[in-house]
Curated annotation (Swiss-Prot):
It comes from the Eukaryota. Its main location: nucleus. This is Pre-rRNA-processing protein ipi1. Belongs to the IPI1/TEX10 family. Keywords: Nucleus, Ribosome biogenesis, rRNA processing. The keyword Cell membrane does not apply. It is found in: Nucleus. The keyword rRNA processing applies. Component of the RIX1 complex, composed of ipi1, rix1/ipi2 and ipi3 in a 1:2:2 stoichiometry. The complex interacts (via rix1) with mdn1 (via its hexameric AAA ATPase ring) and the pre-60S ribosome particles.
């Protein structure tokens, strides 16, 4: 019994306030640390100080590695730093890293879930040299087409914006690379809901672009991108370019083909394989993945597979009026010029 009373007394002591006597200091706790000393230096074992700061190239490489971070803010800030580095570099100076090294890290961000990351990515792509982008068009297009057929409406719009930039930078390479013509047109028709005769029986309605408050702005962007794409693929060639090419090919000779009719058809063709579309001795092939290097080949495929669907879609878009109707007028203008010019000579 005595031990239990002692334990109760000790427990009760913890909750009693100690009475301080005059002239005596308060008792210090057991975990008290004396901080009254003064030191001239403080040494940290894990501190690393360098006389020189990291170079701009090292910082550029570091931010490239941060593009795969799980944080949306980190990816956006890294893209902003890379964009600033590219814009502020001296004229005609090489990039800190070649485009072939940057693209494998940048391209997956086309499908990023964060809109701020995709917006900053487009700014970075526009800061890259156009000449360096032309050689990597086949590497860019699969990601763009994946974004154009994405389930999220904002990602589809961002992918269309990237495609518009790519056509402005390297339009000839986009429409002539393997799969760049038919596959991209199929993506446009899928987004716009302009189905061909084969797919109209089972395909659904036009893909949605999100909230109705957008007032047709996404649709306008898609139509504008389609107009630029068709202009690059089957648009009427510039007559001045044709004249200059003729002068370069035959200097000092003017109008030598006057007595002949369709003289270009009897000359050595400029294409590497002018009769490849006939597939005389080859095996059955995939038309969607082929390269259509000449305007004649692209117009032939467009007329056979897409012309009817595009014309029907333009009529329905023109009936909507407003900005969508004006955007469809731009596509109609390009289409009329292409049809008037025909397959060319």
């Amino acid at each position: 019994m005595g031990s239990s009373a002692k334990k109760k007394k000790e427990k009760k002591k913890d909750f009693q306030k100690t009475k301080l006597k005059v002239g005596k200091t308060k008792a210090k706790p057991d975990n008290f640390t004396d901080t009254s000393f003064r030191a001239k230096t403080i040494t940290l074992n894990q501190q690393s100080l360098h006389i020189t700061a990291p170079s701009s190239d090292a910082q550029f490489t570091h931010h490239v590695s941060l593009l795969s971070s799980k944080s949306d803010t980190q990816r956006r800030d890294s893209l902003a730093h890379l964009t600033t580095s590219l814009v502020s570099r001296p004229v005609d100076s090489p990039l800190p890293q070649p485009v072939s090294v940057l693209l494998p890290t940048l391209l997956p961000l086309i499908l990023d879930a964060s809109s701020s990351v995709r917006t900053q990515l487009l700014k970075l792509l526009r800061a890259l040299p156009a000449n360096d982008i032309q050689d990597h068009v086949p590497q860019l297009l699969p990601y763009i087409r994946a974004g154009m057929t994405h389930l999220a409406a904002d990602i589809r719009v961002s992918a269309v914006e990237v495609l518009s930039w790519l056509v402005d930078v390297a339009g000839a390479e986009v429409v002539s690379c393997a799969g760049g013509w038919i596959k991209t047109l199929n993506c446009f028709l899928s987004v716009l809901g302009w189905h061909t005769e084969e797919s109209s029986k089972w395909s659904g309605n036009r893909a949605s672009f999100g909230k109705s408050g957008a007032k047709g702005q996404p649709m306008v962007k898609v139509l504008a991108a389609l107009a630029v794409f068709l202009q690059a693929g089957i648009g009427r060639p510039d007559e001045r370019m044709d004249d200059s090419s003729d002068e370069d090919s035959a200097p000092g000779v003017s109008g030598w083909e006057f007595p002949l009719c369709h003289a270009a058809q009897h000359m050595v063709p400029q294409a590497t394989a002018p009769f490849v579309h006939l597939n005389l001795f080859g095996q059955p092939r995939d038309e969607e993945g082929e390269m259509y290097e000449t305007r004649e080949d692209r117009y032939r495929v467009f007329e056979n597979r897409f012309l009817g669907a595009v014309q029907r879609g333009l009529e329905s878009a023109r009936g909507e009026g407003g900005e969508v109707g004006r955007a469809s007028a731009g596509v109609s203008k390009v289409l009329k010029e292409a049809i008037a010019y025909g397959p060319g000579v």
